[in-house]
């Protein structure tokens, strides 16, 4: 079978709901008083958008093959990411065979080492990589999970991230992850409010439902350690992303010091096999949580997963909807998945990338069979207005 080549790469941007899931209207739970690295400043505590968490916006990348097939993916990156794709990365994609994904990844990564390695550059590389997998699977008329080796389980089960784990339990999810609302700068009173909120939720969901805390890089080691010990009596399953991503030493100490049986998780804002190698070799966590749209795409996530598997560490990717689902269903060391509750009050199940994507699957009763539609099985919504800020 002769494989087509890639004739065009396009980078588009979108504002509002989409891959940049923080870009929401006022009143959404995700923009509430939630602890962040900026919570040390009172003027930036009440709303995460106040310090610009949503400034990037969504990046949509399309790759078109010589036979007219179009693959696409969405990630966070907006106009900055679009510039990187159009003005730098496109040269490594156009003219290549659709099968040469490894070569294209390697060239994109090494060509951007002097200003990249992590952050928006890796978001852009990840988006291109995901679009390439979507394209190849469509050319072959197969789902992406088939290209990754095939399913190892018939269906996925999910925990829910959002403000209402009690409602998530009613919907059939296996657990609920709450955002932490108060950081160290809010002192003893803030700590007590954090614990009171957890205790209230435990009383609502009962003793056997998983409860976790998402700390979003907002804590220091002493505070995180104390929070873990005081939350242990409330049956906290894990404490997530307590520290800045580069504080590997802090994570290693935290993992040593938390109560026996409590899990330490992180990795949402880590990237590449080298970043995750540090987390694994320094024994920083029990579960790694790479975001496939930020860590380097599927090509890199497979390498990250192999490193973790060799050390007996679980890989539970951060969010990412279909881009995670097609991966998780093919890996034994990814036994469940995360679902971000994107309804404003976290009171119903809606697609993560709504309204940008069509045919995006969602869990029913906390479970899902990953579709066998070619590619990632989703379509761009033609009614969503997109812009192409740069061309090459």
UniProtKB/Swiss-Prot annotation:
CDD domains: MR_like_2. The active site is at residue 318. InterPro entries: Enolase-like_C_sf, Enolase-like_N, Enolase_C-like, L-Rhamnon_dehydrat, Mandel_Rmase/mucon_lact_enz_CS, Mandelate_racemase_C, Mandelate_racemase_N_dom, RHMD-like. It comes from the Bacteria. Binds 1 Mg(2+) ion per subunit. The record marks 338 as: Transition state stabilizer. The record marks 291 as: Increases basicity of active site His. Its EC number is 4.2.1.90. PROSITE patterns: MR_MLE_1 (PS00908). Keywords: Lyase, Magnesium, Metal-binding. Substrate binds at residues 22, 48, 338. Homooctamer; tetramer of dimers. Catalyzes the dehydration of L-rhamnonate to 2-keto-3-deoxy-L-rhamnonate (KDR). HAMAP family: Rhamnon_dehydrat. Belongs to the mandelate racemase/muconate lactonizing enzyme family. RhamD subfamily. This is L-rhamnonate dehydratase.
